[in-house]
Amino acid sequence: MQHPPLDSIRNIGIISHIDAGKTTVSERILFYTGETHKIGEVHDGEAVMDWMPQEQERGITITSTATVCRWGAWWINLIDTPGHIDFTIEVERSLRALDGAVAIFSAVEGVQPQSESVWRQADRYQVPRICFINKMDRVGADYRETLRQMEEKLGARPVLLQLPVGVEASFAGVVDLIAGEFLTFSEADQGSTVERHPIPAEIAGEAMAVREELIEAAADFDDAILADFLEGTAIAAERIRAAIRKGTIACRIVPVFLGTALRNRGIQPLLDAVAAYLPSPRDIPPVTGQRPDGEAVDSLPCDPAGPLCALAFKVQADEGRKLTYLRIYSGTVKAGGALWNSNRGCFEKAARLFRMHAHKREPIDEALAGDIVAAIGLKEVLTGDTLCDPAHKVLLSGLTVPEPVVALAVEPRGVDDRDKLLPALEKLQWEDPTFRVHEDEETGQTILTGMGELHLEVVTDRLGREFGVQVKTGRPQVVYRETITRPAERQEVFRTEFEGKVQGGEVHLRLAPLHRGEGVRIVVPPAEVLGITRELHTALTESLTRGASTGCVTGYPLTDLEVRVITVPVEQGVTTEGGVRAAAGRGLMRAARDGAPTLLEPLMDLEIITPTEYAGKVLGSVQQKRGRVEGIITQGNTEAIRALVPLAEMFGYMTELRSATKGRGGFTMEFSRFDQAPASVLQQFGLA
């Protein structure tokens, strides 16, 4: 493929709640752009974008998948992301690298919990979005209710650019409100032919009224449109589109489109909208970062001739090597070229470059600013690392990585498995920053931690399939957090004798509790203020950071406390880096013990969908689980129950809910926050 002009590139992601139809939409995009010659269906396990065996068997997306397709003059780098909360890091890192997104909502279920979560992630990275309300052919489809929920739950300003013709089973197509046409999609060729007709008389009045609302929204971004609208002057379609594009890129409005991907209706207008309203790499603000000395650098515009700056937003294990996905923000990467890894402080070599088509690869010689590509040969790289020109070193901000909340003990089944287990787990950790591994000091067991039961279930399944490692697993356990309840202070002195010479370190620490959700704040004054060398300063900071990952009583990570370094007395000929590390680590643990430690447990935002006849039984179950009901919404013959529930009470809940609702209920949940654990839990750890 010849490299396209920057203005014609669209780097986009598909985001939504699980089962809203992301992958079904992605498969139609590939088909209508000519990248595939057959539509792969998720329910048949044939989706091109869901290529992992676990995805095909479960009918869900587990890992974000990248591909490239052409739509007219436009070049679309497309990433399909998971909708299940356990794989939220896949959404996080994709949004970090993308310029725009298509948010998919079900016209039946509306804005669901994980939809809210991914929307907040997109807000955090200021990613412009358009919206596709899917499943318009389903019984109970109500796009107006979905629009209302977008406003209420997401704080979005949706702008309707289409109207449906027909509802539920009679859904026939959409009215393009800007062009003033009724669009249908031929069933004879799986929707490939888009036919244009006059707007049906029965909805012409509604179409005119909604078009006026659309023009009013466009007028917020073009004063001339407002003047012409008030004077009754005709406004050209291209002027309206330009104004809508301006508002979309500014993240002030969200254009909304309608359709049913499974029935092959509405995808081509969505592709037109990707080209018309979502930004090119040139439209997004220039990337900024820091120099190695901490000073801010000038912004780096998206220019292939500029200094190289790229983000490694995903690392995947590939036959023992690392396959690294790169977003090129500035400059050019050549196959075989040397790069500087700002996070690891070392040179790397991109031996080979590829354009990815799901799990298939197209070798390329170079990648330019605006590209999303993959590289083999980067040995030290991890997710979130910055790769740049050695002559223009820069460090970009990394990713927001959520902390794991579920733990699982594993042990190898046989001797051969024991030798292969840790190397396999290391490779899986390359891929997933939310997956952690450690050894229980008391039992010697290998402990896996992750975002949920499904997350760890997929990990153990991959151990067997991809690495040939068979393991026995324990029951999932909650990952608690330790914190302190009162201030504490410690002057820690460490001394040891090595080859007849006394060595050591001394650190004065002050700890204070923080509000819930503030995490760990480590305050270390600059080296010159403390009167220590840069090497001692680094040793001190690293020791405190490492120490905070292990609590003083239970071994669970510390959270919601401030660790402040007051002084670091230096004794000439005695103070060493190792001594300072030991004093800092031991001082932190002892100070935390003096701070009246306690445990925090993870609380989950839970949404249960149940037939009304079983709602009473379900509510009783939630209350028995120490849950706090926060809202109940009636939707026809079903109830949507929202509650805050401790994760410890939720293991195996799907089986319980199915039994209570005769298989008709379902639920979703996502992490909310850590809060005080009850006395029964504290007693287990000797803290009550």
Curated annotation (Swiss-Prot):
GO biological process: ribosome disassembly
Name this polypeptide is given: Elongation factor G 2
HAMAP family: EF_G_EF_2_B
Any single GO CC term annotated in Swiss-Prot or TrEMBL for this entry: cytoplasm
Pfam family, one: GTP_EFTU
Binding site for GTP: 16-23, 80-84, 134-137
Highest taxon above the source species: Bacteria
PROSITE patterns: G_TR_1, G_TR_2
Origin organism lineage: Bacteria, Pseudomonadati, Thermodesulfobacteriota, Desulfuromonadia, Geobacterales
Keyword Iron found: no
Family listed: Belongs to the TRAFAC class translation factor GTPase superfamily. Classic translation factor GTPase family. EF-G/EF-2 subfamily.
Annotated CDD domains: EF-G, EFG_III, EFG_like_IV, EFG_mtEFG_C, EFG_mtEFG_II
Gene: fusA2
Keywords associated with the record: Cytoplasm, Elongation factor, GTP-binding, Nucleotide-binding, Protein biosynthesis
